[in-house]
Amino acid sequence: MHIHKIQAREILDSRGNPTIEADVILTTGIIGRASVPSGASTGSREACELRDNDPKRYAGKGVQKAVKHVNNEINQALQGLSVEDQENLDRILCQLDNTENKSHLGANAILATSLACARARALSLNQPLYITLNQGDMMTMPVPMMNILNGGAHADNNVDIQEFMIMPIGAPDFPVALQMGTEIFHVLKSVLKKQGLNTAVGDEGGFAPNIQSNRQALDLLSEAIEKAGFRLGEDIVFALDVAASELFNEGFYHMYSENQKFDSHQLIEYYANLISSYPIVSIEDGLDEKDWSGWKQLTTHLGNKVQLVGDDLFVTNPKILREGIAQGIANAILIKVNQIGTLSETRQAIKLAYDNGYRCVMSHRSGETEDTFIADLAVASGCGQIKTGSLCRTDRTAKYNQLLRINELASLPYAGKNILKR
């Protein structure tokens, strides 16, 4: 299981922007391949995504520099090493980069290599990836957070909240959960059409109509759920990704579609009112990533009622998560492998969360590829929840389809309503 060669190439993501794909070729001829996603609303403390900044190619978004780093320094450093020791490989990658945010080699170059090594190991062992990724956690099939109505930075519309998600917690298993979500998605399209609303989709495959308010979005989802024959609050519950850092300006949170602005306390009250009106069980990035005093208030007021997920807040970084845990900030973390840049550091963040009673939600990015690594990692880590977009666009459904394959192989329990237990 030793590395013969590592080579990378520039490919396109789901937004038509360049990203990097790496092949780890073993001495046996086995090839492990992985590609890296890219975010639109990003946390300021994410690991550095290295771009070329050459205006003559891809409007500056090329990744040839990152590709060269893989083909040269990274290839030379890892040649001859075993893929059996993931932590050692990732440690060498971090030492080779030698920056706090992986800005020398690029987190995209490092991550593509890290994930490709893990995939090469699974292929060498002739085992499914989710099996070789498991480190003793109880594996479950995750509840999907299906982003079927998009706003914010993920859509070209006037909706403030970035993601309105449905969670089929009442399903008996993952295939039925996927079926439920898909049926609601198609009914929602007809509901929008009937009201003369746009049925074009955003980056993550959800519909992106211009509507009057965030409450109207939840009302539209409620109507679609009921018309599809499901019970709101029993079969299906809601989750929100506010991406509040995108709404924060000069000390206030601006809900432009509703012509309102809030300070932290007022926005917390706004959420409390929504929670009392709709079966919302999870709010992600409810406040700005730097508004830690506000986050403390939010956690104190609503942390015993809903899951409060830190995305931009924690950026899958164990060091930052540790600070949040110490201060009682949030009660869950979003896991995005490209925010931190290696598989090992991602695992560290997951373990730290579990050890301190925080939940984990596995997540894609808005600029995705056909790579399904996160589906296997969600199952392997037993996190119980996954965000991978809506029920259309192959970059999203690829992850759902991989989860169907895993479910068929493993007959694992579906997390379902267990995610609500505190």
UniProtKB/Swiss-Prot annotation:
Record-level GO BP terms: glycolytic process
One Pfam family of this chain: Enolase_N
Residues bound to (2R)-2-phosphoglycerate: 162, 336, 365-366, 387
SMART domains given in the database record: Enolase_C (SM01192), Enolase_N (SM01193)
Binding site for Mg(2+): 241, 284, 311
Catalysed reactions listed for this entry: (2R)-2-phosphoglycerate = phosphoenolpyruvate + H2O
UniProt-listed CDD domains: enolase
Co-factor: note: Binds a second Mg(2+) ion via substrate during catalysis.
Location in the cell: Cytoplasm; Secreted; Cell surface
Active site residues per record: 204 (proton donor), 336 (proton acceptor)
Co-factor(s): Mg(2+)
Gene3D superfamilies, A to Z: Enolase-like C-terminal domain, Enolase-like, N-terminal domain
Enzyme nomenclature, EC number: 4.2.1.11
UniProt pathway: Carbohydrate degradation; glycolysis; pyruvate from D-glyceraldehyde 3-phosphate: step 4/5
GO cellular component terms, A-Z: cell surface; extracellular region; phosphopyruvate hydratase complex
Major enzyme class: lyase
Keywords: Cytoplasm, Glycolysis, Lyase, Magnesium, Metal-binding, Secreted
Tree of life domain: Bacteria
Molecular function per GO: magnesium ion binding; phosphopyruvate hydratase activity
Family, similarity comment: Belongs to the enolase family.
Subunit text: Component of the RNA degradosome, a multiprotein complex involved in RNA processing and mRNA degradation.
Role of this protein: Catalyzes the reversible conversion of 2-phosphoglycerate (2-PG) into phosphoenolpyruvate (PEP). It is essential for the degradation of carbohydrates via glycolysis.
HAMAP family assigned to the protein according to its UniProt record, in alphabetical order: Enolase (MF_00318)
Protein name: Enolase
Organism of provenance: Legionella pneumophila (strain Paris)
Gene: eno
